[in-house]
Amino acid sequence: MNDQTTGPVATEMLLRLDSVLSPTKMDLTDDSEQHRGHGGYNPAGESHFSLKIESAAFTGKSRVERQRMIYSALGDLMHERVHALSIRAAAPGE
């Protein structure tokens, strides 16, 4: 996990992903400041993220299936708090 991303939204995202997907590797970065002045930007931050995640749960799953699993794990955060999420999801060994 990434200790540099410690805001309340990022913390909740990491907890949910860890609980549902049991990742072997996970890195979540808050990219919000790079989107200042763009649509969905929140001055409070924590609106735009990049996620790199490796989980055995992704074995045999397509890219779209993996993204759906992540969105499902994040639930209401994707609708209420997170404007954009860039995802790199892999199974171990990929």
Regions found by a protein language model. Name each.
Residues 2-94:
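N-terminal, polar/charged subdomain of small-to-medium soluble alpha/beta proteins
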